[in-house]
C-alpha cells in the first residue's frame, strides 16, 4: 500500500516540477533576472562570525548567510508576503466580481499587475514546500529492506524539488529589490593617472586600464566613442574620456569608479632602471550620461576659455585656439577638451561631459537621501575610494570591497570574461546588501 501511494505521489510531483520549471520560464520577462549563488546571501549581523570561500580556482571570500531558506523563514518577510498575497486575492476578487469606475478599475488593475508575479511565486513556493513535507512523511514509513530503491528515488525527488524551491526563493528576492533608475543610462568614462616618483608607471597603467574598458565595451557589444585622449611619454596616458553606449552600461560599470592601484617592476621609463617594485595609482570616474532634458545648462552660468592644444596631434597643435575650457560658475566644475581640430566640436564634447558631471551630482544627492546610515558592502561608492589592486609581481588582481581575487593579470586586462565575472560578483553583492536593507528598513516594524 505504501509503495503504491509513493509511486502515485512521485508521479504527481514530477508533474509539479515540470510546472515549476514552465512557470519560471513563463514569467521570466516580468522579473529582472540576475544569476545568484544561493550560498552567498549576506546578513550584516553575522558578517564578523561566518566566513565562506567558494571552491573554485579564482576564489572569493565573503561573509554570508547560511541558506536562502533561512532568509525566507525570516518572520518579517513571511508576514510581508502574507499581506501582499491577501492584497492580491482581494484585488483579484474586486476586479472579477465588483463593479468600479473606470479610474478606480485602472488603478486596481495596475496594482494587481504589480503583485501578480510575487503572488504566483509565493503560491508555488508554498506548494513545493508542502510537497517536500508529504514526501518526507511517506519516506518515514519506508523502513523495509525491499523498499530501499523507493527510498533512494524519493530522496532524489526531494533534492530536485529543493533545487526548484531555491530557484523560486532567488526569483522572489530579485523581484523585491528596488530597481536602479539609472542602470539603463549610457556613461562617460574618465581615467586619470596618479602621481608617484617617476610617474611613468601610473601613466602606463592608466593606458592599460583604459584599453581594458575599451575591450570590455567590444566584448559586451557596446559603442565606444573617444572624447578626449592626452598621451604621455613611453606609451603612457595622462587622461582620457569616452562615451560608452549600449544596453545597461551604467549598471555594469557603476562600481568601477574609484582608485585602482598597481604594484609592479616597471619595464620601460625612468623607473625601470631601479628594478624594484613600484606602487602607483590611477582613478576611474563613471558618470551616467544624461539626456538633455535631464540636465539643462544655462549659457549664462558658463565661462568659456579657448587656448592652444598641447601634445601630439598634427599641424593644428600650438597654432590655433582649438582647445576649449568650460567653467560652470554656480558649481565651480571645470571641463577641458582638445581632442578635435574644431573648436566647435571640442565645445560640444566639453558640454557633454559637464552635463554628465552635473547629472552625477544630482544622482549622489538623491542617493544620500535614500541611503541608510550603514554603508553598502560594495563600498561607499565614492569615486575617491581605493577599490582594486593589480599586483603584477604576484600575478593577482584583488577587489577590496568583496575580497575577490583572480589570477592571471594579462587575461584580466584583456577586458573580457575575467572582468565580466568580477563585475557580476559586484552586482551580486549589491543585490545581497539590498535584500538586507529591505529586511532591516522596510520590515523592522513586523515583530
Curated annotation (Swiss-Prot):
The stretch annotated as transit peptide is: 1-63
Q: Which PROSITE patterns match?
A: RF_PROK_I
* Annotated GO MF terms: translation release factor activity, codon specific
Where is the motif named GGQ mapped on this chain? 313-315
One of the record's GO cellular component terms: mitochondrion
What ranges does the record give for the region GGQ domain, renumbered to this chain?
299-363
Q: Which InterPro entries match?
A: PCRF (IPR005139), Pep_chain_release_fac_I (IPR000352), Pep_chain_release_fac_I_sf (IPR045853), Prokaryotic/Mito_RF (IPR050057)
Q: Which UniProt keywords apply?
A: Methylation, Mitochondrion, Protein biosynthesis, Transit peptide
Which residues get modified to N5-methylglutamine? 315
- What GO terms describe the biological role, i.e. biological process, of this protein? mitochondrial translational termination
> Post-translation: what modifications?
Methylation of glutamine in the GGQ triplet by HEMK1 is conserved from bacteria to mammals.
* Localization (cell): Mitochondrion
What SUPFAM superfamilies is this protein classified in? Release factor (SSF75620)
Q: What does this protein do?
A: Mitochondrial peptide chain release factor that directs the termination of translation in response to the peptide chain non-canonical stop codons AGG and AGA. Non-canonical termination codons AGG and AGA are found at the end of MT-CO1/COX1 and MT-ND6/ND6 open reading frames, respectively.
Provide the domain comment: The GGQ domain interacts with the peptidyltransferase center (PTC) of the large ribosomal subunit to trigger nascent chain hydrolysis.
Similarity comment? Belongs to the prokaryotic/mitochondrial release factor family.
The name this protein carries in UniProt is: Peptide chain release factor 1, mitochondrial
Organism of origin: Bos taurus
